[in-house]
Regions:
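Non-catalytic DNA-recognition/assembly elements of restriction-modification systems
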Residues: 1-53, 177-271
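Sequence-specific dsDNA recognition surfaces
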Residues: 37-52, 66-96
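Short coil/turn segments at secondary-structure boundaries
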Residues: 52-61, 156-158, 227-228
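A structural connector/turn signal
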Residues: 88-89, 117, 161
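Beta-sheet entry/capping signal
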Residues: 98-100
Length: 271
Protein backbone atom coordinates (compact mmCIF):
# COMPACT_ATOMS: atom_id res chain seq x y z
CA UNK A 1 0.00 0.00 0.00
CA UNK A 2 1.32 3.45 -0.93
CA UNK A 3 1.54 5.98 1.87
CA UNK A 4 2.30 9.68 1.70
CA UNK A 5 2.15 12.28 4.44
CA UNK A 6 1.04 15.79 3.46
CA UNK A 7 -0.14 18.67 5.59
CA UNK A 8 -3.62 20.10 5.14
CA UNK A 9 -2.06 23.36 3.98
CA UNK A 10 -0.12 21.56 1.22
CA UNK A 11 -3.25 19.77 0.03
CA UNK A 12 -5.25 22.99 -0.02
CA UNK A 13 -2.49 24.86 -1.87
CA UNK A 14 -2.34 22.16 -4.56
CA UNK A 15 -6.11 21.90 -4.82
CA UNK A 16 -5.73 18.14 -5.20
CA UNK A 17 -6.35 15.43 -2.62
CA UNK A 18 -5.64 12.31 -4.71
CA UNK A 19 -2.47 10.44 -3.78
CA UNK A 20 -1.45 9.87 -7.41
CA UNK A 21 -1.04 13.62 -7.92
CA UNK A 22 1.27 14.01 -4.93
CA UNK A 23 3.43 10.91 -5.39
CA UNK A 24 6.66 11.61 -7.34
CA UNK A 25 6.67 10.31 -10.93
CA UNK A 26 8.45 6.98 -11.40
CA UNK A 27 9.45 6.91 -15.07
CA UNK A 28 11.63 10.00 -14.90
CA UNK A 29 13.84 8.30 -12.29
CA UNK A 30 15.42 6.18 -15.05
CA UNK A 31 17.30 9.24 -16.34
CA UNK A 32 20.37 10.80 -14.67
CA UNK A 33 19.24 13.43 -12.18
CA UNK A 34 21.71 16.00 -13.50
CA UNK A 35 20.02 15.93 -16.94
CA UNK A 36 16.51 16.64 -15.65
CA UNK A 37 14.94 20.05 -16.29
CA UNK A 38 11.50 21.53 -16.09
CA UNK A 39 10.03 22.30 -19.49
CA UNK A 40 9.94 26.02 -18.65
CA UNK A 41 13.73 25.93 -18.11
CA UNK A 42 14.35 25.00 -21.75
CA UNK A 43 11.30 26.44 -23.50
CA UNK A 44 8.55 29.04 -23.24
CA UNK A 45 4.83 28.40 -23.34
CA UNK A 46 3.83 30.81 -26.12
CA UNK A 47 0.70 32.93 -25.67
CA UNK A 48 0.56 34.68 -29.08
CA UNK A 49 -3.00 35.04 -30.35
CA UNK A 50 -4.86 36.33 -33.39
CA UNK A 51 -8.59 36.44 -34.13
CA UNK A 52 -9.02 35.32 -37.77
CA UNK A 53 -12.63 36.54 -37.85
CA UNK A 54 -11.38 40.14 -37.94
CA UNK A 55 -10.32 39.48 -41.54
CA UNK A 56 -13.26 37.37 -42.76
CA UNK A 57 -12.03 37.00 -46.36
CA UNK A 58 -8.41 36.15 -45.57
CA UNK A 59 -7.57 32.41 -45.80
CA UNK A 60 -5.54 30.63 -43.16
CA UNK A 61 -4.65 27.10 -42.16
CA UNK A 62 -6.13 25.79 -38.94
CA UNK A 63 -4.34 23.18 -36.86
CA UNK A 64 -6.67 21.40 -34.45
CA UNK A 65 -6.36 18.18 -32.48
CA UNK A 66 -7.43 16.06 -35.46
CA UNK A 67 -4.51 17.53 -37.45
CA UNK A 68 -1.98 15.61 -35.34
CA UNK A 69 -1.01 12.06 -36.25
CA UNK A 70 -0.75 10.47 -32.81
CA UNK A 71 1.35 7.55 -34.07
CA UNK A 72 4.19 9.72 -35.34
CA UNK A 73 3.62 13.06 -33.64
CA UNK A 74 3.43 14.95 -36.93
CA UNK A 75 1.02 17.51 -38.37
CA UNK A 76 -1.25 16.04 -41.04
CA UNK A 77 -4.12 17.59 -42.96
CA UNK A 78 -4.85 20.94 -41.29
CA UNK A 79 -8.02 22.69 -42.43
CA UNK A 80 -7.99 25.44 -45.06
CA UNK A 81 -10.43 28.10 -43.83
CA UNK A 82 -11.29 31.74 -44.33
CA UNK A 83 -11.56 34.13 -41.42
CA UNK A 84 -15.36 34.06 -41.47
CA UNK A 85 -15.27 30.27 -41.00
CA UNK A 86 -12.91 30.31 -38.03
CA UNK A 87 -14.17 28.37 -34.99
CA UNK A 88 -14.02 30.11 -31.63
CA UNK A 89 -11.01 27.98 -30.60
CA UNK A 90 -8.93 29.10 -33.60
CA UNK A 91 -6.83 31.73 -31.85
CA UNK A 92 -3.25 30.60 -31.14
CA UNK A 93 -0.56 31.84 -33.53
CA UNK A 94 2.20 29.31 -34.16
CA UNK A 95 5.78 29.75 -35.32
CA UNK A 96 7.77 27.26 -37.35
CA UNK A 97 9.28 24.59 -35.06
CA UNK A 98 6.87 25.32 -32.20
CA UNK A 99 5.62 22.19 -30.45
CA UNK A 100 1.88 21.62 -30.08
CA UNK A 101 0.72 19.61 -27.07
CA UNK A 102 -2.92 18.58 -26.89
CA UNK A 103 -4.07 19.51 -23.39
CA UNK A 104 -7.18 17.31 -23.63
CA UNK A 105 -6.42 13.63 -23.00
CA UNK A 106 -2.70 14.44 -23.07
CA UNK A 107 -1.59 10.84 -22.51
CA UNK A 108 -2.59 10.05 -26.12
CA UNK A 109 0.61 11.79 -27.19
CA UNK A 110 -0.97 14.20 -29.67
CA UNK A 111 2.23 16.26 -29.73
CA UNK A 112 3.72 17.64 -32.95
CA UNK A 113 6.36 20.00 -34.33
CA UNK A 114 4.96 22.80 -36.50
CA UNK A 115 6.48 22.51 -40.03
CA UNK A 116 7.89 25.61 -41.71
CA UNK A 117 4.98 25.80 -44.14
CA UNK A 118 2.58 26.47 -41.25
CA UNK A 119 4.58 29.40 -39.86
CA UNK A 120 2.21 32.19 -38.69
CA UNK A 121 -0.86 29.99 -39.05
CA UNK A 122 -3.52 29.37 -36.39
CA UNK A 123 -3.80 26.51 -33.90
CA UNK A 124 -6.59 25.54 -31.54
CA UNK A 125 -6.65 26.83 -27.98
CA UNK A 126 -6.82 23.13 -27.11
CA UNK A 127 -3.04 23.07 -27.58
CA UNK A 128 -0.30 24.22 -25.30
CA UNK A 129 2.24 25.87 -27.63
CA UNK A 130 5.81 25.21 -26.49
CA UNK A 131 8.61 27.27 -28.06
CA UNK A 132 12.13 25.90 -27.50
CA UNK A 133 14.84 28.27 -26.33
CA UNK A 134 17.41 29.18 -28.96
CA UNK A 135 19.96 26.68 -27.60
CA UNK A 136 17.50 23.76 -27.46
CA UNK A 137 16.71 21.54 -30.45
CA UNK A 138 12.93 21.53 -31.09
CA UNK A 139 13.03 18.03 -32.59
CA UNK A 140 14.78 16.72 -29.50
CA UNK A 141 12.30 18.56 -27.27
CA UNK A 142 9.45 16.98 -29.24
CA UNK A 143 11.01 13.55 -28.68
CA UNK A 144 11.39 14.21 -24.93
CA UNK A 145 7.80 15.44 -24.60
CA UNK A 146 6.50 12.18 -26.11
CA UNK A 147 8.51 9.95 -23.76
CA UNK A 148 6.44 7.62 -21.53
CA UNK A 149 7.94 9.37 -18.49
CA UNK A 150 6.52 12.68 -19.74
CA UNK A 151 3.09 11.24 -20.51
CA UNK A 152 3.06 9.71 -17.02
CA UNK A 153 3.46 13.19 -15.53
CA UNK A 154 0.73 14.56 -17.80
CA UNK A 155 -1.55 11.84 -16.43
CA UNK A 156 -0.73 12.86 -12.87
CA UNK A 157 -1.49 16.53 -13.56
CA UNK A 158 -4.76 15.78 -15.41
CA UNK A 159 -8.12 16.78 -13.98
CA UNK A 160 -11.53 15.56 -15.09
CA UNK A 161 -12.76 12.02 -15.67
CA UNK A 162 -14.50 11.92 -19.08
CA UNK A 163 -12.03 14.28 -20.77
CA UNK A 164 -8.95 14.59 -18.54
CA UNK A 165 -7.02 17.76 -19.32
CA UNK A 166 -3.92 19.65 -18.26
CA UNK A 167 -3.03 23.35 -18.21
CA UNK A 168 -0.10 25.31 -19.62
CA UNK A 169 1.21 25.50 -16.07
CA UNK A 170 1.26 21.70 -15.87
CA UNK A 171 3.27 21.46 -19.08
CA UNK A 172 5.73 24.06 -17.76
CA UNK A 173 6.51 22.13 -14.56
CA UNK A 174 6.92 18.73 -16.22
CA UNK A 175 10.39 17.19 -15.95
CA UNK A 176 12.25 15.94 -19.03
CA UNK A 177 15.82 14.75 -19.65
CA UNK A 178 17.92 17.38 -21.47
CA UNK A 179 21.38 16.26 -22.63
CA UNK A 180 24.09 18.45 -24.18
CA UNK A 181 23.34 20.47 -27.31
CA UNK A 182 25.49 18.11 -29.40
CA UNK A 183 23.62 15.06 -28.10
CA UNK A 184 20.29 16.77 -28.76
CA UNK A 185 21.28 17.30 -32.40
CA UNK A 186 22.38 13.67 -32.73
CA UNK A 187 19.11 12.38 -31.27
CA UNK A 188 17.08 14.77 -33.42
CA UNK A 189 18.84 13.52 -36.56
CA UNK A 190 18.19 9.88 -35.64
CA UNK A 191 14.51 10.54 -34.94
CA UNK A 192 13.90 12.57 -38.11
CA UNK A 193 15.71 10.03 -40.32
CA UNK A 194 13.79 7.14 -38.72
CA UNK A 195 10.50 8.94 -39.33
CA UNK A 196 11.47 9.60 -42.95
CA UNK A 197 12.38 5.91 -43.41
CA UNK A 198 9.02 4.92 -41.92
CA UNK A 199 7.17 7.25 -44.31
CA UNK A 200 9.06 5.88 -47.31
CA UNK A 201 8.32 2.28 -46.27
CA UNK A 202 4.62 3.09 -45.96
CA UNK A 203 4.59 4.78 -49.39
CA UNK A 204 6.29 1.74 -50.96
CA UNK A 205 3.87 -0.66 -49.28
CA UNK A 206 0.87 1.41 -50.40
CA UNK A 207 2.25 1.53 -53.93
CA UNK A 208 2.74 -2.26 -54.04
CA UNK A 209 -0.75 -2.81 -52.63
CA UNK A 210 -2.47 -0.49 -55.11
CA UNK A 211 -0.45 -1.87 -58.04
CA UNK A 212 -1.44 -5.44 -57.14
CA UNK A 213 -5.11 -4.50 -56.91
CA UNK A 214 -4.81 -2.73 -60.27
CA UNK A 215 -3.25 -5.80 -61.89
CA UNK A 216 -5.99 -8.06 -60.53
CA UNK A 217 -8.68 -5.70 -61.81
CA UNK A 218 -7.00 -5.51 -65.23
CA UNK A 219 -6.87 -9.30 -65.50
CA UNK A 220 -10.52 -9.62 -64.60
CA UNK A 221 -11.50 -7.04 -67.21
CA UNK A 222 -9.16 -8.45 -69.86
CA UNK A 223 -7.30 -5.17 -70.35
CA UNK A 224 -3.55 -4.78 -70.43
CA UNK A 225 -1.74 -3.84 -67.26
CA UNK A 226 -0.33 -0.34 -67.67
CA UNK A 227 3.02 0.25 -65.97
CA UNK A 228 3.27 3.37 -63.89
CA UNK A 229 6.10 4.98 -62.03
CA UNK A 230 6.14 4.92 -58.28
CA UNK A 231 5.47 8.29 -56.73
CA UNK A 232 8.69 9.71 -55.42
CA UNK A 233 8.97 10.78 -51.82
CA UNK A 234 8.96 14.48 -51.13
CA UNK A 235 12.53 15.65 -50.77
CA UNK A 236 12.41 18.96 -48.99
CA UNK A 237 15.46 19.99 -47.08
CA UNK A 238 14.42 20.04 -43.44
CA UNK A 239 16.79 21.76 -41.00
CA UNK A 240 17.52 19.45 -38.09
CA UNK A 241 20.40 20.86 -36.06
CA UNK A 242 19.72 23.65 -33.57
CA UNK A 243 21.96 26.06 -35.51
CA UNK A 244 20.19 25.39 -38.82
CA UNK A 245 16.78 25.70 -37.18
CA UNK A 246 17.66 29.07 -35.64
CA UNK A 247 18.95 30.31 -38.99
CA UNK A 248 15.69 29.25 -40.63
CA UNK A 249 13.59 30.95 -37.93
CA UNK A 250 15.52 34.21 -38.39
CA UNK A 251 14.69 34.12 -42.11
CA UNK A 252 10.94 33.83 -41.50
CA UNK A 253 8.57 36.82 -41.24
CA UNK A 254 7.37 38.02 -37.84
CA UNK A 255 4.24 36.43 -36.46
CA UNK A 256 0.99 38.25 -37.14
CA UNK A 257 -0.40 38.80 -33.65
CA UNK A 258 -3.39 40.88 -32.55
CA UNK A 259 -2.08 44.38 -31.92
CA UNK A 260 1.00 43.87 -34.11
CA UNK A 261 1.41 43.33 -37.89
CA UNK A 262 -2.33 43.11 -38.45
CA UNK A 263 -2.67 44.64 -41.93
CA UNK A 264 -4.80 42.73 -44.41
CA UNK A 265 -1.70 42.12 -46.53
CA UNK A 266 0.08 40.32 -43.68
CA UNK A 267 0.31 36.76 -44.90
CA UNK A 268 2.49 33.86 -43.79
CA UNK A 269 5.26 32.87 -46.16
CA UNK A 270 4.96 29.20 -47.00
CA UNK A 271 8.28 27.52 -47.40
Amino acid sequence: MKRLVKSLRELQAAGRWDIDFHLPPEGIKSFPADTLCRVDEVADVAKDKRDPTRLPDVPFQYLDISSVDVATGSVANPQDLEGAEAPSRARKVVRAFDILISTCRPTRGAIAVVPRKYHDQIASTGFSVVRAHDDVNPFYLHFALRLPSTLEQFRKWSTGSSYPAILDEDVAKTLIPVPSAEEQDRIALLVVLALDARDQAIRKANYAWNRTLGEITSRLSGSAVMPDAMEKAESGSVPITTADIQETIRSLPELTIDGRNTSTEAQAVLI
